[in-house]
């Protein structure tokens, strides 16, 4: 296989990466299982996004706990601080997220 960029993983992170690369490049996304068998596709209960600063510490603590406290704290901070812009980008790309009866996005936190 010849490609300019190889992305390993077809979950949300891998696909978001592919969407943000130059269209002039040959991009290949590979996955170890079917497209509907990755953790992003199988996730339940909505998504996480920093709604305001009062939510930061809880979001940070939950993320660290989910990673068994092996996460790089600086990376977790970047992920949390950029979560709103990532969600906005995904909506622009046409992502179909769960919404409530009022049409508002459903969040886990």
Predicted region positions:
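Conserved N-terminal/central alpha/beta ligand/cofactor-binding core
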Residues: 35-109
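N-terminal Rossmann-like FAD-binding beta1-loop-alpha1 element of flavoenzymes
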Residues: 4-29
């Amino acid at each position: 296989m010849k490609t300019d960029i190889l992305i390993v993983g077809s979950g949300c992170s891998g696909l978001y990466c592919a969407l943000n690369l130059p269209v002039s490049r040959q991009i290949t996304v590979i996955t170890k299982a079917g497209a509907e068998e990755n953790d992003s596709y199988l996730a339940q209960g909505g998504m996480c996004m920093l709604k305001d600063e009062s939510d930061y510490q809880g979001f940070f603590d939950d993320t660290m706990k989910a990673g068994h406290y092996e996460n790089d704290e600086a990376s977790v901070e970047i992920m949390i601080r950029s979560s709103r812009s990532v969600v906005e980008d995904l909506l622009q790309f046409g992502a179909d997220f769960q919404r409530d009866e009022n049409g508002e996005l459903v969040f886990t936190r």
